């Protein structure tokens, strides 16, 4: 591969990861963004507010509304208005989505293992540190 600037490489890595993840998830009728919502909800005990999902994904309100709406139509999520604060919409995993959790976690681990296969543990640790620095520079 010809020498490219770092931003270009990061973008291309992201694009390739998204294509691979979307292909892996197609049989589950999920996209990468939707799988991230499922993983987040799982980490929060199965439910969270729509606003919490927006903050976690770092995307706009309309983007989250679209993602959640499609997932609800596909039977992955249930949604309702929070009785204690009507401004909040609560989003929860369905039993169908909960059952997919273990398989999705295994796919994530397999993809990460493939991605980092030629790196040592020290290289991986250093890479994480450097990526966090770059990420924080953009804040």
Give residue spans per PLM region.
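N-terminal leader segment of winged-helix/HTH proteins
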Residues: 1-28, 74
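Hydrophobic structural patches
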Residues: 10, 38-41, 131
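Charged, amphipathic alpha-helical coiled-coil/dimerization segments
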Residues: 18, 69-129
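Alpha-helical DNA-recognition elements
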Residues: 23, 70, 133
